[in-house]
């Protein structure tokens, strides 16, 4: 009987410690991207699209291939086509503060490398993180044959310029890097 009195509280303590430890090992957030491709003729692309999302301190999450990381539209769906609203939702480490900047990049591959992007909306949700939504108006071609002749669009809605929050200007922005895919 005495063993049972000691064993039961010990097992409860062990279960509680394990639950807390496992909860802290899973700090991931869910990031959902809504990307609207323009309805302009030839606005769609077959290129691989990557993104980096930044918080106000310059910490960021990098996603090498949005479609491979978290495409929700199904296996036969053709992403980034004219007029489409494409949705991607996946897990990645939580950033310390809400997203406020975006680097959206096309690799320029495929038969149709040019891509006209209307906007990107990103929502963030996490167990111990503040839920947030950030809208980025792009209204730009990501192409080498159309103005502005860039495969990257950068939008910064941060209250402080990212450059002011980091010590190394022009290089990788800060210390926290996580390439998801």
Curated annotation (Swiss-Prot):
What is known about the tissue distribution of this protein?
Expressed in root tips, pericycle cells, lateral root primordia, stomata, leaf vasculature, hydathodes and floral organs.
Location in the cell reads: Endoplasmic reticulum; Plastid, Chloroplast, Plastoglobule
CDD domains listed in its UniProt record: PLAT_plant_stress
> Tell me, what does this protein do in biology?
Positive regulator of abiotic stress tolerance involved in the regulation of plant growth. May be a downstream target of the abscisic acid (ABA) signaling pathway.
Gene Ontology CC terms: chloroplast thylakoid membrane; endoplasmic reticulum; plant-type vacuole; plasma membrane; plastoglobule; secretory vesicle; thylakoid
Q: Which BP terms does GO give this entry?
A: response to cold; response to salt stress; response to water deprivation
Name of the protein: PLAT domain-containing protein 1
Name the SUPFAM superfamilies for this protein.
Lipase/lipooxygenase domain (PLAT/LH2 domain)
Please give the InterPro entries that the UniProt record associates with this protein. PLAT/LH2_dom, PLAT/LH2_dom_sf
Any idea where the PLAT domain is? 29-156
N-acetylalanine carried by residues: 15
Q: Please name the PANTHER family in this protein's record.
A: PLAT DOMAIN-CONTAINING PROTEIN, PLAT DOMAIN-CONTAINING PROTEIN 1
Give the keywords, sorted.
Acetylation, Chloroplast, Endoplasmic reticulum, Growth regulation, Plastid, Signal, Stress response
Which N-terminal stretch is annotated as signal sequence?
1-14
Q: What is its main location?
A: endoplasmic reticulum
Tell me what induces its expression: By salt and cold stresses, and abscisic acid.
**What does the record note as the disruption phenotype of the gene behind this chain?**
No visible phenotype under normal growth conditions, but mutant plant have enhanced sensitivity to salt, drought and cold stresses.
Which Pfam family, any one of them, does this sequence belong to? PLAT
Kindly list the organism's lineage: Eukaryota, Viridiplantae, Streptophyta, Embryophyta, Tracheophyta
């Amino acid at each position: 009987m005495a063993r049972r009195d000691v064993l039961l509280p010990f097992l409860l303590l062990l279960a509680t410690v394990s639950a807390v430890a496992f909860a802290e090992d899973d700090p991931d957030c869910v990031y959902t991207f809504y990307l609207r491709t323009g309805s302009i003729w030839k606005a769609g692309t077959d290129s691989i699209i990557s993104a980096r999302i930044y918080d106000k301190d310059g910490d960021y999450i990098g996603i090498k291939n949005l479609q491979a990381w978290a495409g929700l539209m199904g296996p036969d769906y053709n992403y980034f086509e004219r007029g489409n609203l494409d949705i991607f939702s996946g897990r990645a480490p939580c950033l310390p503060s809400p997203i406020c900047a975006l680097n959206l990049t096309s690799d320029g591959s495929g038969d149709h490398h040019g891509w006209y992007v209307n906007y990107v909306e990103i929502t963030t949700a996490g167990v111990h993180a503040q839920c947030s939504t950030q809208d980025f108006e792009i209204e730009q071609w990501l192409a080498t044959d159309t103005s502005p002749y860039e495969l990257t669009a950068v939008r910064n809605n941060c209250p402080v310029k990212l450059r002011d929050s980091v010590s190394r200007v022009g290089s990788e922005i800060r210390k926290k890097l996580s390439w998801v895919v």
